Regions:
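Core catalytic lobe of class I
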Residues: 1-161
Length: 161
């Protein structure tokens, strides 16, 4: 039985105070843990220069710690379409808080089901374009480890900027 932790979740007022400290230059960063859409809703528009993120890969990790049965855990959706839709929801908030001169760096992994590559990076990139994002580049991150044995030897992940 896994223990559910909620002591690190912050209320909206506390999040706004932490965001204000960073934006006012009182500190260089602040770690805020919580539901990304809720946390980002407390940020003012166009206040972030750069976002670098690697959201949970679809159906590849168990991030159960801290989640309650009512929580939606990104990466644990039943269908790829639901995963993509949930990510687009988060990135809609990111788009709002990102300055017009800002950049998003997104690292996203893929998944095989029954030896069929799901194309999750492509699905997410196309959905983000449909949501108004501009895709500037597809960056290959060469990794030195990793192969499922029955797949061609591709040791890389897609990054999107």
């Amino acid at each position: 039985l896994k223990e559910t932790r909620t002591d690190y979740l912050l209320d909206s007022r506390t999040i706004k105070q932490k965001v204000r400290k960073v934006l006012d230059g009182e500190c260089s960063f602040e770690l805020i843990v919580g539901d990304s859409q809720k946390v980002l809703s407390d940020f003012p528009d166009e206040c972030i220069d750069c976002v670098i993120t690697s959201p949970p890969y679809w159906k590849l990790r168990d991030y159960e710690i801290g989640a309650t049965s009512q929580d939606m855990v990104i990466g644990d959706e039943g269908k790829p379409e639901d995963y993509v839709r949930n990510l687009v929801g988060v990135f809609t908030q990111i788009h709002r808080v990102l300055k017009s001169t800002g950049s998003l760096w997104l690292n996203i992994g893929d998944k095989y089901i029954n030896k069929n590559l799901m194309g999750m990076p492509w699905r997410v990139a196309l959905a983000l374009q449909d949501a108004g994002w501009i895709l500037r580049n597809d960056i290959i991150w060469e990794k030195m480890k990793g192969s499922l044995g029955w797949t061609p030897l591709s040791r890389h992940e897609n990054g999107v900027s």
